[in-house]
Design a protein with these regions (language model features):
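Conserved catalytic cores of very large enzyme subunits
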Residues: 1-76, 97, 103-107, 111, ...
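Contiguous, well-ordered alpha-helical segments that form the cores/surfaces of helical PPI scaffolds
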Residues: 80-93
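Hydrophobic, structured segments
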Residues: 89, 102-103
Length: 212
């Protein structure tokens, strides 16, 4: 994912919203969008701001680290990664709270809700300004985080949970296309492919070309 960052730069920090846990705090969809999600995003952004302030103003990293001293990295090309995981769990919980059966990756209303959540996160990030992220217009970069070893029942980023993928690969690719645009600093998906593909690598290349 660091390939999405500026050459000669990097990320001060990566923090993440665990969207499923935020949804568990909500009484309903309205409460999620008006209270729970904004509260957690604000707390995380302030936490990231303080981490960045310390790194730049107090730690001495950019004055003492050999990478900076030898010109390999430059502070003014750094930004930060505003991460998220658990979109699938979040959407499914909110759908249940609204008395609806649709699930993320299989239902248009559920997928539309996922896009609505991403629009809210994107709007918050675009409104939040950090003085030391000037390389990216003063804003963090959104990042669909793949998870950590301790995660339980948390689906990475905006992925459809493993085992719940659509039967047709094209349907999964279309689903991905609705979310990938939000994440300049990285996102990823897992696609089940039949083992016989080893005999026909051109098939995979065609899928990649079609996906792009």
């Amino acid at each position: 994912c660091y390939n999405g960052l500026l050459l000669g730069g990097g990320s001060y920090t990566l923090c993440r919203l665990i969207l499923g846990n935020i949804a568990k705090r909500a009484k309903d969809k309205k409460d999620f969008f008006e209270n729970q999600l904004p509260y957690v995003m604000e707390r995380m952004a302030l936490y990231m701001d303080e981490r960045i302030r310390f790194e730049v103003e107090e730690s001495g990293f950019f004055e003492s680290n050999f990478l900076a001293k030898e010109g390999f990295i430059h502070r003014d090309r750094f930004t930060a990664m505003f991460g998220m995981v658990g979109m699938a769990e979040c959407v499914n919980i909110l759908m249940e709270l609204e008395g609806k059966k649709g699930r993320f990756g299989h239902d248009k209303e559920a997928d539309d809700l996922g896009v609505e959540i991403m629009e809210a996160i994107s709007a918050f990030n675009n409104a939040h300004v950090n003085p030391y992220c000037e390389a990216t217009g003063g804003h963090f970069l959104l990042h669909a985080q793949v998870g950590i070893a301790q995660d339980k029942n948390i689906t990475p980023g905006t992925r459809i949970p493993i085992g719940e993928e659509p039967k047709e690969l094209i349907d999964q690719l279309r689903h991905c296309s609705r979310f990938h645009k939000y994440f300049p600093s990285g996102t990823g998906d897992i696609f089940p492919v039949d083992v016989t593909v080893h005999k026909n690598p051109q098939f995979v290349l065609d899928i990649v070309k079609g996906a792009f």
